[in-house]
A protein has these predicted regions:
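Flexible, solvent-exposed coil segments and beta strand-coil junctions
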Residues: 1-7, 54-64, 135-144
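Short loop/turn motifs that connect adjacent beta-strands in outer-membrane beta-barrel proteins
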Residues: 1-6, 31-39, 70, 86-97, ...
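Short glycine/proline- and aromatic-enriched beta-strand/turn motifs that initiate or cap beta-hairpins
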Residues: 1-45
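Residues that define the transmembrane beta-barrel architecture of outer-membrane proteins
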Residues: 6-8, 18-22, 36-38, 72-76, ...
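Membrane-embedded beta-strand positions of outer-membrane beta-barrel proteins
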Residues: 10-12, 40-44, 78, 99-103, ...
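Transmembrane beta-strands of outer-membrane beta-barrel pores
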Residues: 14-18, 30, 44-50, 82-84, ...
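Outer-membrane beta-barrel translocator/channel fold
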Residues: 41-92
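Outer-membrane beta-barrel transmembrane domain signature
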Residues: 100-165
Length: 165
């Protein structure tokens, strides 16, 4: 973690609502004192509803879709905070334990979820609507980029408190 005056790191994160890959992080830190650091970072996180389930198309195309899904939700989070080294590791042995606190703006990025739908033996790409679409006529999900031009931004605030091992 912190062996110099200034450091940066990036990575891929996993979270309980994010699927296989939850998101990504980029963080910069600068030393304030021996065990205390100022941090500035940005995270982009995929947020899935806990009840999302993938289904295979009843039409036999091998494509999957999520019944009931209206939007993809990503959270873009800016963070400014502090990190305190609680236990420092000895050279290449042991573990380091850090306490972290950060706060900053969040922007929820809502992107409409589109499906490929069979209507009158033709495939159509449409925004999912359970009052219009029937389960057995869904071919699968459309490209993620299908609704990108209809993105909606929802502002908010995020607070992060963590112990890092």
């Amino acid at each position: 973690y912190f062996d110099t005056e200034n450091e940066k790191y990036w990575g891929i994160s996993k979270n309980s609502w994010g699927g296989l890959i939850g998101g990504g992080v980029l963080k910069f830190s600068s030393k304030i004192s021996d065990n205390f650091y100022k941090t500035i970072g940005v995270e982009l996180v995929n947020i899935r509803h806990p009840n999302e389930n993938k289904y295979s198309s009843a039409l036999g195309f091998g494509r999957t879709f999520i019944w009931g899904k209206k939007n993809y939700l990503f959270s873009l989070r800016g963070q400014y905070g502090r990190e305190l080294i609680i236990i420092n590791k000895k050279e290449q042995e042991g573990i380091r334990i850090n306490a972290q606190f950060a706060i900053g703006p969040s922007f929820g990025l809502l992107i409409p979820y589109y499906i490929k739908y069979s209507r009158n033996n033709r495939m159509e790409i449409e925004n999912f609507d359970s009052s219009v679409h029937t389960f057995n006529n869904v071919i699968g999900s459309a490209s993620f980029l299908e609704g990108i031009n209809e993105i909606k931004i929802k502002p908010g605030v995020n607070i992060k408190a963590a112990l890092n091992f």
